[in-house]
């Protein structure tokens, strides 16, 4: 699992930061899942090493323009490319009407292989490898955070031990690797878990924006490997955060601490903290680290590989 930040600015782009979009790359299945698609995201994708052709799912948090204005252009390009690969889109119910209106008035057809899924709190998608769920956050309009959870994996299969027990290679190895108990032709029952190393706990990535500090974000983020959380304002601008229902750096850190996450990555920064101003992003970083030391700042085109972990 690799996270690539395509846009890390709040509201409007700056010279060094585009508006919101994050790509989650899943190399083992050659897929990219996109979270939000602000204006200019297509250009950011072209400047990155993320392949547009691998995008299979797009998750939208809410209907503010800095999170959706790039979606129509991206989908139009996907349609022109003619790959025919299904793209599943998850977002608020209004998103479907928005896309249809854009298509109608700009005279293009939405690609036929796009499927829309209105979101609701709970599990939105699940297969053998991953599940995606969402929870309501606290913003001026309905906004949802997403939790991507990887399934636990069996530990490494000990082939030599299996051979020493007289188990010949074959389909039975596949069952044992999954931790199943199998009965051999001689009547012996062999437990797969006895031939596998420590079970590998699945990784969890959380994407929380836009929101002020809320219990919903904490519940969604519990025991995550990575929490991507908005930090629009510095602590001294907390009143602005409460007025506009955005988070400060310290609010993001408090969510990370309460949820006991392993790594906090802050994003969605107000342009007011640009270099040369009285307060800068390094100040927000220090504020957050005073509460939650494992904090870093996202920047456009930064890639973070989510490390695997063993069972706790």
UniProtKB/Swiss-Prot annotation:
Sites where the protein binds Zn(2+) 1: 62, 64, 139, 210
Active site: 66
Keyword Nuclease part of the UniProt annotation: yes
EC number, UniProt record: 3.1.26.11
Catalytic activity: Endonucleolytic cleavage of RNA, removing extra 3' nucleotides from tRNA precursor, generating 3' termini of tRNAs. A 3'-hydroxy group is left at the tRNA terminus and a 5'-phosphoryl group is left at the trailer molecule
Assembly with partners or alone: Homodimer.
Protein name, entry field: Ribonuclease Z
